[in-house]
Amino acid sequence: MAFLQVVLLMLLPSALAEKWAVIAAGSQGFMNYRHQADACHAYQIMLRSGVKAENIILMMQDDVAKDSENPFPGQLFNKPGNDSPDVYKGCKVDYAGDIVTAQLFLDVLTGNTTGAKGKILKSTEEDTVFVNFVDHGGVGIVAFPNGPFLHVKELSQTLKKMQSQKMFKQLVFYMEACESGSMFPDLQKDGKILAVTASNGQESSWGTYCGDAAMVKGKNIGSCLGDLFSVSWMEDDDLGKFASETFKHQIASVTKRTNQSHVCSFGDKSFENEAIGKIEMALEGMNEVAPSAAGSVDARDIYVSQAYWAWQNANDEMKDKAWTRLVRIVEDRQKDDQLFAKIGLKACGECPKCQEKMLGDRSELKDMECHSMLAQEVHKHCPVSASHHATGGWNGYNMKFSQVLLNLCEGKEALGKNVEELSKIIQDECTEAKGITELVV
């Protein structure tokens, strides 16, 4: 065989390699505007950078652009300014509405045609895959707009399945959520998966371009435009440095700009020094300077912060309605605080030190099975917070109490209780709280 033929055969796998992207926004409602704006911005970056449209899979509720509160119907903006681009224009949503669930996300990732009836990941061992998830989270869990949450146990199993099915040469996973650093506990250092998270496993992520900073073309959107970690990496990508900038350099830049939480990276860092363009290809002609993020708010407080801003800025006609909305959000937060305090009290009995430990400790997640079971009990039995657009017992605020469930699981031996007994405590307290809520409503 001629030398040239041998060389061509050796180059054939890389020449045939494809680039894929899976993007998911896990929330719904206008208060969560930023998540769908983030997702569409990510879609535009993938498309603009040369990833084939048929290789980009986007799932989100897709309700914000058409929401009656949107001052620009049919449009979404991910940054402020008079020249801010409409990221919704040309943003092709593959899965929208009530079908967007955690299970659908997992089915798409693993190429399961039984569960996902539309586009799925069809990548091979020669391909590179980029996954981007944006939404609310807590220790070991992230939310979806419909159905149950996604647990770290399920995500871990899915990534291992993708590895065993040889679905990628390299996979990069960017996750925007509170406590997102808790979602990748067992990535191998040589597993060809690099995960980057908006926060560590014990802190909130942050929204940005909120309040007075949410001005677009002379109008205030009335909701945060983006998330600090997400806009940081995307506005960095918008600078058009893909061909030369490495993942390591981008992570360092994004870490510096994401100054309210600790950006973390997990897994295989052997390709950190490779150019981002190897995963996402290279952008040309994008040289605008990224504006510095302003108006950042702890993601846990965005609902109450936005409601307060809306009340302050409401006209006389809307003042009472805005106040009622603000009061409802504050009351719902207080109910969540009280509910999880009661769960801790019931588990501990009359032991103040134990209660303090259950509610305040930052134990590490080890017993995933127990934590998953208790988290499911909250989803199934606790009151649904309409003010937080929740579809189960978890919402963007109370997901911070996922840590309490972790503490219960890791302390169950000292408590003298098994998983079933802890589950019963949650069922009873949530059912009682739900009954009180229904009586009030």
Labelled PLM ranges:
Residues F3, L9-V441:
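Cysteine endopeptidase catalytic domains of the caspase/legumain-like
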